[in-house]
């Protein structure tokens, strides 16, 4: 990715910022999804998949940066420590570059259109998240599908499309569910930090569940998340016990399990050798 930025970005100051952004990235799970789907469907062009994988990681990084700038959190990130105008321009360059690189992997018009469709779907999901649009479990799941599901579907679907030249609806279906699972995991981890969606009263699955106030612990937790001085005094074990008493943890686990079962059911319909299906599942579910 750093080599691509060096080659494509002529403005040295802008390049320096982008290189710093990339250096902060320590995982490449979306590139792995693209690569393993490409290989599972017998892709052979090493250069093409390398371009797609690099472009995908640049795209994911740009969306992560946009998310931080919009939510004004993750203060320790390098892009949050510089002038917001510089950060915004730099991330726009990163996003544009990512699209350009991915589209170079294949010259088929439909390939580029699918990439843009996934990106636009995620942006629309992000808008619903920013304005706190979801008011029910169903609308929240739809928002998650658009925001997170589309970004997870992109590497899986495009990896297969690069290998076969065709859009694969089954791959799209289970990869959206994978995105929902990942977001549920993120929401769960966020329950244990003060600067989380609860403080902003974001209508996440967990917050919507608590708002139903099924028991006294739910009411207590809703109040607790609005009192920073009390929240920081509670240890993780006690907080986890309260979340369990309120039923939040069980609820999120059930939702995650439902997505996992859908993934396994869809993957069983793939016309792949068993070892390839198992390999894909092991890459997706860790």
Map each language-model feature to its residues.
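Intrinsically disordered, low-complexity segments enriched in Gly and acidic/Ser/Thr residues
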Residues: 219-221, 231-234
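Catalytic cores of Mg2+-dependent Asp-rich isoprenoid enzymes
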Residues: 14, 18-39, 204-209, 237-241, ...
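A short structural micro-motif
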Residues: 121, 181, 227-231, 262, ...
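Gly/Pro-rich interdomain helix-loop hinge
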Residues: 216-226, 241-242, 251
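N-terminal amphipathic/basic leader segments beginning at the initiator methionine
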Residues: 1-4
